[in-house]
């Protein structure tokens, strides 16, 4: 084993992984550590040095609130030097060479970049910098606990709605997955969207193995997620 790759938080059940402990383990055993922060970038502070992270991947369209189709990764030079580019092509630099440039970021950015998406992500990051990440996190966790409590108040024995994962906000992000036990989940998602304008994500969430571990395969779950602009009033509509 040379490399450990893990997500920072599950996009299915919301559990946040102990990045510090994993990083310490990797350093102790001489392992490279790559962290996928798709679900946490912009909402949970991450110290790459403290957690001994060699590469950190992120998407722009979730917690960073940028356009879809944007994302990137932060990578240490020692790891970058060991990786062959997945795609090669022109970069607009070192055009005299038949080889992809060895320097960053050009080595991993062939072709024409998604400039509109990058500018949109930049605008989103500028807006994000005006806010406190901790305040965003606490607001999202408040909504998460409020929603979980609301489900349990409606269905204490979970006979109709089963919450997947923890029922508190300890080591959690703002994702709540449920299973509808007496209604097709795709139909429930459709009605939430078409009747109430509530967008959810239904199915296996590109994470079939997570669903197998959680016992929700092959049906999957109906997932709700909350952001800094959401309110308790909106959650009340969903709960009703």
Regions found by a protein language model. Name each.
Residues 1-240:
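Pyridoxal 5′-phosphate
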């Amino acid at each position: 084993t040379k490399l450990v790759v893990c997500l920072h938080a599950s996009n299915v059940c919301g559990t946040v992984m102990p990045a510090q402990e994993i990083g310490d383990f990797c350093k102790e055993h001489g392992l490279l550590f790559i962290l996928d922060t798709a679900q946490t970038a912009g909402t949970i502070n991450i110290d790459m040095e403290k957690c001994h992270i060699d590469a950190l991947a992120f998407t722009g369209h979730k917690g960073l609130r940028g356009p879809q189709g944007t994302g990137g990764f932060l990578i240490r030079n020692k790891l970058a030097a060991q990786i062959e580019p997945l795609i090669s092509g022109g970069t607009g630099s070192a055009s005299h060479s038949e080889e992809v440039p060895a320097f960053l970021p050009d080595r991993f950015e062939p072709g024409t970049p998604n400039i509109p998406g990058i500018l949109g992500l930049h605008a989103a990051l500028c807006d994000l910098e005006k806010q406190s990440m901790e305040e965003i996190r606490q607001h999202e966790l408040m909504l998460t606990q409020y929603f979980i409590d609301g489900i349990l108040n409606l269905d204490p024995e979970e006979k109709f709605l089963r919450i997947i994962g923890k029922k508190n906000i300890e080591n959690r992000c703002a994702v709540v997955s449920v299973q509808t036990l007496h209604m097709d989940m795709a139909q429930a998602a459709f009605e939430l969207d078409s009747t109430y304008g509530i967008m959810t994500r239904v199915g296996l969430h590109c994470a079939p193995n997570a669903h197998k571990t959680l016992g929700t395969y092959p049906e999957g779950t109906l997932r709700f997620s909350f952001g800094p602009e959401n309110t308790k009033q909106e959650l009340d509509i969903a709960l009703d």
